């Protein structure tokens, strides 16, 4: 079976969704700039050999509709002979794009893919046009479509306190800020034009969403936002609303080597799994267990882990049940996570994978895991290996 590898991976800075730096930049533009960036950074690659562009996006309407993968690839000037498809596994969409490209390579259905994802949550909100079938209530709890309430449920089931959530959120902002100041995001961020508060055109080079001033005291002052009477989940312990895109060049290993392109990581194993929609945030646990089994390793073999921080109340139960509580500060989300950087839905899977690969290089690590929960009760996971 052929081997799929990551040759390159980049992302936009994460822009604040409310009046942020990308308020006048469309989702197709964010996507196209990254596609062009991958080609500029890897001139040995002939664009005419691209098999397919696979792009994750959740809200496929308005500027993100009518197959944004194709719209963005045409905008980027990718040869018209390349295919393009937009995929939707909700929060796991761009990780699903990684998996689809890897499976195609493994089965000989192409050797060069551009994958990634985007979500402009300022232009197309998460709940835009959502209309759940009334009959779903026969099979799942009514609140299962309300992500914040599923986090409340999962946190209660696992005894996660308000203070634990606040501490996890503070850690996310502190680590993301430190990564910015120390230049650890520089290799993964691809600068994109945006606009400052006065409307002037600027080159955006840093994430806009991080709040380095976040403290236990400031978070303690916030009221629960999803269950005001009895809840513990606040806006401060939830993933920030942000706009962004991420992209990867995924190739068959021998083809990449023949072109003299770098092999930044191999895709060692992949998995998806389902769980109860009422505790959708638990999905990373069964997905990770599957991926580890397929890789023939245990959780203790992992050097670095990126767990998407949809909510602190969701992340902590996953950390606990994966047996990782004692190694959080050594292995998990070392550059912060979505609480600080935001969770542009279709972007996040490739974004956390990009951050993971850069962290693995920084730490000279061998094995890494990227995993995330998915609305309505799923999880997705990928094990990467540096060679």
UniProtKB/Swiss-Prot annotation:
Pfam families: Thiolase_C, Thiolase_N. Heterotetramer of two alpha chains (FadB) and two beta chains (FadA). InterPro entries: FadA, Thiolase, Thiolase-like, Thiolase-like_sf_Thiolase, Thiolase_acyl_enz_int_AS, Thiolase_AS, Thiolase_C, Thiolase_CS. GO terms for cellular component: cytoplasm. Keywords: Acyltransferase, Cytoplasm, Fatty acid metabolism, Lipid degradation, Lipid metabolism, Transferase. The active site is at 91 (acyl-thioester intermediate), 343 (proton acceptor), 373 (proton acceptor). Belongs to the thiolase-like superfamily. Thiolase family. It is an enzyme of class 2 (transferase). Pathway: Lipid metabolism; fatty acid beta-oxidation. One of its GO terms (molecular function) is acetyl-CoA C-acyltransferase activity. The lineage of its organism: Bacteria, Pseudomonadati, Pseudomonadota, Gammaproteobacteria, Alteromonadales. This is 3-ketoacyl-CoA thiolase. Its main location: cytoplasm. It is found in: Cytoplasm. It comes from Shewanella sp. (strain MR-4).
